[in-house]
A protein has these predicted regions:
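Flexible, glycine/charged-enriched surface loops at secondary-structure junctions
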Residues: 62-69, 91, 115-121, 168-173
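An anion-binding catalytic pocket shared by soluble metabolic enzymes
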Residues: 120-124, 128-140, 149-150
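Cap/lid and interdomain-hinge subdomains that line or gate substrate/regulatory clefts
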Residues: 1-102
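Structural motif
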Residues: 94-99, 121-123, 147-152
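Redox- and metal-dependent alpha/beta enzyme cores, enriched for Fe-S-associated oxidoreductases
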Residues: 138-173
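Soluble secreted/lumenal catalytic domains
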Residues: 108-115, 166
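Short, ordered loop/turn segments at secondary-structure junctions
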Residues: 13-15, 123, 173
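Short, well-ordered alpha-helical microsegments
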Residues: 101-105, 155-156
């Protein structure tokens, strides 16, 4: 629990792995999420591609939304909309199609002065951290906790890649 003063910003996109969101719809390699193998996931099947609906099903807090047209318009408009949404919503879903969109969202979140909890597959968190901490990259050993809530083939492939390249401690629950 982070406290009432935090806002969760959900950026479900990860363009580098084929995940983008347009019009509150999560696309995986151009296919709506509910039409992918995620629909048949044995542990948590997905029945909608609408990100706000998925979040609403998992939270008791009001969910706001910022569309792609606001993300690409200008940083001033995006910041204005972020602050407006934060007044009424604890959770804000934001569309992104490209890494540049994600960088723009992260820059606005950092500039907003809001306490932000990043909810995403990773690229938004990295961009937000880069904006918040603006420091040189250093080779620092850090611990990282990852939670995997899916049993899809893609998730298994990603976990195999992680095992091969990072030597993680994997705990199955």
């Amino acid at each position: 629990y982070l406290g009432e003063d935090y806002r969760a910003v959900v950026v479900a996109s990860f363009p580098g792995s084929g995940r983008t969101s347009i019009g509150d719809i999560l696309l995986v390699n151009g296919v709506p999420l509910q039409m992918t193998e995620a629909a048949n996931d044995p542990t948590s099947p997905v029945h909608t591609s609408r990100i706000t609906e998925i979040v609403k099903q998992q939270s008791r807090y009001p969910v706001g939304y910022i569309g792609l047209e606001q993300v690409v318009e200008s940083s001033g408009k995006l910041l204005e909309e972020l602050l407006k949404q934060a007044e009424e919503h604890r959770i804000i879903v934001v569309d992104a199609r490209t890494a540049r969109d994600i960088d723009a969202i992260a820059a606005c979140c950092a500039a907003s002065g809001l306490k932000i909890a990043a909810i995403d597959p990773g690229s938004f968190t990295a961009a937000l951290a880069g904006n918040l901490f603006k420091r040189k990259k250093e080779a620092i050993q850090k611990k990282l906790l990852c939670g995997i809530g899916s049993a899809s083939d893609l998730t298994r492939q990603q976990l195999q890649y992680l095992k091969k390249n990072a030597n993680p401690l994997v705990v199955r629950i």
